Amino acid sequence: MNIRQQLTQFLSLAYVFTSAFVIWKSLGIITNSHSPIVVVLSGSMEPAFQRGDILFLWNRDQEAKVGDIVVYEIQGRNIPIVHRVLREHHNSDKQLLLTKGDNNAVDDLGLYAKKQKYLNQKTDLVGSVKAYLPKLGYVTILITENVYFKYGMLGLMCISTLLTNE
């Protein structure tokens, strides 16, 4: 394999990663959410959503209503949580929310940051769930939970790119 073929393969791989990044950022701008697509990581929302379901979010500064399924992040942690709005009220110009997983016995007050009694719709919500694809995100869970699977997939992607003759 000559240098021109190697450079072409490298550029093809860079093109794939760049395209994925541009699509991700474009979705973020369109949906006004830093994470427009999330994967359900636990069974707390069963039977509505199963572990491994992919959720598509929308966050165009809409107020959440009781019964809406929202994704939020707790201050200081980067793990998105998918739960249903149990209660909402307004405090001056802020919408405050209390959430609960459908499969959980109690509300999420114990999950929130210390001294936090409600979620702030503007600062804590990642988005509201608008659509989902069942089980397609299970690969993400495998990659996250299994180091060997993660490196195996990465290795296969690199090898397949290097062995391609185009």
Curated annotation (Swiss-Prot):
Q: Where does the record say this protein resides?
A: Endoplasmic reticulum membrane
Keyword annotations for this protein?
A: Endoplasmic reticulum, Hydrolase, Membrane, Protease, Signal-anchor, Transmembrane, Transmembrane helix
Q: Name one GO biological process term.
A: signal peptide processing
Q: Which SUPFAM superfamilies match?
A: LexA/Signal peptidase
Which residues are in coiled coils?
Answer: none
Q: Which Pfam families match?
A: Peptidase_S24
Catalytic residue list: 44 (charge relay system), 83 (charge relay system), 108 (charge relay system)
- Which regions of this chain are Cytoplasmic-facing, per the record's topological domains? 1-9
* Residue spans crossing the bilayer: 10-30
What membrane topology term does the record carry?
Answer: Single-pass type II membrane protein
Q: State a GO cellular component annotated for this protein.
A: signal peptidase complex
Region C-terminal short (CTS) helix, residue ranges: 152-163
EC number(s) on record?
3.4.21.89
Q: Name one GO molecular function term.
A: serine-type endopeptidase activity
- InterPro entries reported for this sequence: LexA/Signal_pep-like_sf, Pept_S26A_signal_pept_1_Ser-AS, Peptidase_S24_S26A/B/C, Peptidase_S26, Peptidase_S26B
Q: Which reaction does it catalyse?
A: Cleavage of hydrophobic, N-terminal signal or leader sequences from secreted and periplasmic proteins
Q: How does it assemble?
A: Component of the signal peptidase complex (SPC) composed of a catalytic subunit SEC11 and three accessory subunits SPC1, SPC2 and SPC3. The complex induces a local thinning of the ER membrane which is used to measure the length of the signal peptide (SP) h-region of protein substrates. This ensures the selectivity of the complex towards h-regions shorter than 18-20 amino acids. SPC associates with the translocon complex.
Q: What is known of its domains?
A: The C-terminal short (CTS) helix is essential for catalytic activity. It may be accommodated as a transmembrane helix in the thinned membrane environment of the complex, similarly to the signal peptide in the complex substrates.
Q: What does this protein do?
A: Catalytic component of the signal peptidase complex (SPC) which catalyzes the cleavage of N-terminal signal sequences from nascent proteins as they are translocated into the lumen of the endoplasmic reticulum. Specifically cleaves N-terminal signal peptides that contain a hydrophobic alpha-helix (h-region) shorter than 18-20 amino acids.
Q: Which family does it belong to?
A: Belongs to the peptidase S26B family.
Q: State the name under which the record lists this protein.
A: Signal peptidase complex catalytic subunit SEC11
Organism from which the protein derives: Scheffersomyces stipitis (strain ATCC 58785 / CBS 6054 / NBRC 10063 / NRRL Y-11545) (Yeast)
